[in-house]
């Protein structure tokens, strides 16, 4: 059966996803940045409260995936901490200036990962050549690649996703970015064994007093009195749709 990974931005949301039948959690902070390394407090709660596999992301900042020396030192420390806390897997990715896999740095992070399964995240979608990248990640021992098929969303990337799935001699190709109830069957149809979704809904703030004219974000369009959370009902339906493939 195709596995369902849910991207969660809090332990509370991860617990909802677990209860709804998710197979695995990708744990992140900062949805507006596309996912950053979660705090120590979040990691500690996750390892104590969740029973399904949790893969924290290691991404020290938003923006591109070509990191300074300081950024990379932070990443190494985070990978080591996540390993020592007992997580089953970890998510990261590093590119060089030319958009290729940064092999020396990836080798260091892979070594620090120990026995954890490694997911190479959507830095893959920014790679210069996905076929070369797939071969390099195979040689590195990466367990899976999260990708939209180098498109803005995974449905547009279906042709490349299918090619990568058929070509892979190692890493699991996991579709992510815009995977929803309405299109999940398309990823099953091309043979993928894992999909990734946020399955989210907007939660309104419980605050009744709202200070006018003051925001914390540099983006004035952001609604700071709402946040994203996993929709357990959506996770249940998606998991049910994946389960049906067992009987087809």
Curated annotation (Swiss-Prot):
* Protein's UniProt keywords contain Membrane: no
Q: Where in the cell is it found?
A: Cytoplasm
Which SUPFAM superfamilies does the UniProt entry name for this protein? CutC-like (SSF110395)
Q: Extract one GO molecular function annotation from the record.
A: copper ion binding
Q: Which GO terms describe its cellular component?
A: cytoplasm
Q: Keyword Transmembrane: yes or no?
A: no
Q: Which UniProt keywords apply?
A: Cytoplasm
Q: State the similarity comment.
A: Belongs to the CutC family.
- Stated name of the protein: PF03932 family protein CutC
């Amino acid at each position: 059966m195709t596995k369902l990974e849910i991207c969660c931005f809090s332990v509370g949301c991860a617990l909802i996803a677990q209860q709804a039948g998710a197979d695995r959690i990708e744990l992140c902070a900062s949805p507006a940045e596309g996912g950053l390394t979660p705090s120590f407090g979040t990691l500690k709660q996750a390892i104590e409260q969740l029973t399904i596999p949790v893969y924290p992301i290691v991404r020290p900042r938003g923006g591109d995936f070509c990191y300074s020396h300081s950024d990379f030192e932070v990443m190494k420390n985070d990978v080591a901490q996540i390993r020592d806390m007992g997580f089953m897997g970890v998510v990261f990715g590093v590119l060089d200036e030319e958009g290729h896999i940064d092999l020396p740095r990836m080798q260091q992070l892979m070594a620090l990962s120990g026995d954890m399964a490694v997911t190479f995240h959507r830095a893959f979608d920014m790679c210069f050549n996905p076929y070369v990248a797939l071969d390099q990640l195979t040689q590195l021992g990466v367990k899976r690649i999260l990708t939209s098929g180098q498109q803005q969303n995974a449905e547009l990337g279906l042709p490349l996703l299918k090619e990568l799935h058929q070509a892979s001699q190692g890493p699991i190709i996991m579709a992510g970015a815009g995977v929803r109830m309405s299109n999940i069957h398309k990823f099953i149809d091309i043979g993928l064994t894992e999909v990734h979704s946020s399955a989210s809904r907007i939660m309104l703030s419980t605050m009744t007093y709202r200070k006018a004219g003051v925001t914390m974000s540099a983006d004035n369009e952001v609604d700071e009195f709402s946040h994203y959370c996993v929709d357990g009902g959506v996770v249940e339906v998606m998991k049910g749709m994946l389960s049906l493939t067992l009987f087809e």
